[in-house]
Amino acid sequence: FENIAEKFPPSEFSMFIALAYSEMNKKRTKFFNETKNKGYELYSFVHPSTKIWDEFEMGENCFILANNVIQPFVKIGNNVLIGSNNLISHNTTIGDNCFITSNVTMGGHITMGKNCFVGLSATINQRIKIGDECIIGAGTIITKDVNDKEVYAENSSKKLPQSSEHIGDII
């Protein structure tokens, strides 16, 4: 990767970084930043079965899979992965380097920080603020704001004593 610009000059080529989620998206973020620093334009992909309403904004190197519904006035940052069958409601902002798995329901007017993970079938009620580097576990229902680096698991929405800094190294 260090010499990629010699073989594929940024003035002639664009890229998509196809790395899956791991370690709170740290590797994907590292390659995103290095690729941008080399001068590359990064493409995003949205599956054709995803329904996107008007007034949608999306950053670079995003990957949105099949059968999502993305309502009006949604903003998605750079380097975001969104699995299948999600509902992202109106006026929602998703920060850079987040991973939304599948079957997630997000109410309207949600603000999500950077480097967050949302597990399978999680639900986030409307008008919720989620800080940076948070983990929302599978099946969790979020009914109140989530501070930076907090971890919520199970459908009881109990905050765990561990910080996402520690858990991020194992998932």
Protein language model regions, located:
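Phosphate-bearing ligand-interacting subdomains
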Residues: F1-H47
